């Protein structure tokens, strides 16, 4: 049995693919880092879309993150126009770019777990178990 996806989810997936290409090919700002779109959440009425991004190599630099978000939000009108040309939608959602910290947080939690396991092994070896 096939999985059922809502229309907004299908539109979000298509927007994610289209925006990735547009950002890579059309935005020529040298200040823009290597952007990865992790998710696109589209409202039910298709009026707004939240685009979640990560920036490779600049995850710890808050100023770089803010600068990249500013560049993308300033280019949102242009990107929306280009999406309108490539997607068959009556109305194209307004684009809102947000930083996705979940990947960075996942890496931090993974390192904490690895450290805890290493300390546990060290203590069990000292006790002779």
Curated annotation (Swiss-Prot):
Protein origin, superkingdom: Bacteria
Subcellular location: Cytoplasm
GO molecular function terms noted in the UniProt entry: ribosomal small subunit binding
Keywords: Cytoplasm, Ribosome biogenesis
UniProt record, GO biological process: maturation of SSU-rRNA
One cellular component (GO) term of this entry: cytosol
Similarity annotation: Belongs to the RbfA family.
Description of how the protein assembles with itself and partners: Monomer. Binds 30S ribosomal subunits, but not 50S ribosomal subunits or 70S ribosomes.
Function: One of several proteins that assist in the late maturation steps of the functional core of the 30S ribosomal subunit. Associates with free 30S ribosomal subunits (but not with 30S subunits that are part of 70S ribosomes or polysomes). Required for efficient processing of 16S rRNA. May interact with the 5'-terminal helix region of 16S rRNA.
The protein's name: Ribosome-binding factor A
Organism: Stutzerimonas stutzeri (strain A1501)
Origin organism lineage: Bacteria, Pseudomonadati, Pseudomonadota, Gammaproteobacteria, Pseudomonadales
